[in-house]
Amino acid sequence: WKNKGFKIYGMQSILYGYEDFNIFKSELDRNKLLGVIKKINMVAKNLGVSFITFGCPKNRFQFKNQSDNLAIDFFRLISKNLDKNITLCIEPIPKIYNNNFLTNTKDVLKFLKKVNKKNILCQLDMSAIKINNDNLNYILKFKKYIGHIHISDINLGKIQYNEENKRIINFFIENFKKKVFTIKILGNKESNLERISKSITNINRIINEF
């Protein structure tokens, strides 16, 4: 892929297969998660990846009456163990995916202000913004906490050409010109190339109308 001019900017689903470990469950679980993330960090470094995404809801399900401080301290510890060129981005996972901690962009941004580490940032995700009806103007107040950006659609299907997507993609372009935008689509066994092609066509149509 290097010889063909491809660059890998981000890694998603970094904790796939480790869903049983939860940052709120125990110190043992947090240490195991940290160990996995250290290994992912090395893989990302070797691939030249800039962003790794913390997104799985099962790794962060918050039990009743537990303090956010457990998570704040955990992500500060992660910060110390990342390569200087790698940023971990926390993705908001809406409640419809059985998540109850950092479910929307506003919550993630407020949390990151408490973590206060330059290499622990927010991943803007178009699908999450749509599901949560996030306030785009609020996001701009915390612009320095934005790391990676995913253009995705509901249920991770192909990116549609519609007014809501136009509004959000135009917001991304207008306010995050220096960022690399990546398309996130869930693969299937039948028509991956077709879904990717149609998504790129629809995104280009939106960009050209901007």
Where are these regions (language model features)?
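Histidine-acidic metal/acid-base catalytic patches
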Residues: 34, 38-42, 48-50, 105-210
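Active-site acidic/histidine proton-transfer and metal-coordination neighborhood
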Residues: 20-121, 131, 195, 202
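Hydrophobic residues within beta-strands of alpha/beta enzymes
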Residues: 9-11, 52, 88, 149, ...
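Aromatic-lined substrate-binding rim segments of carbohydrate-active enzymes
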Residues: 1-5
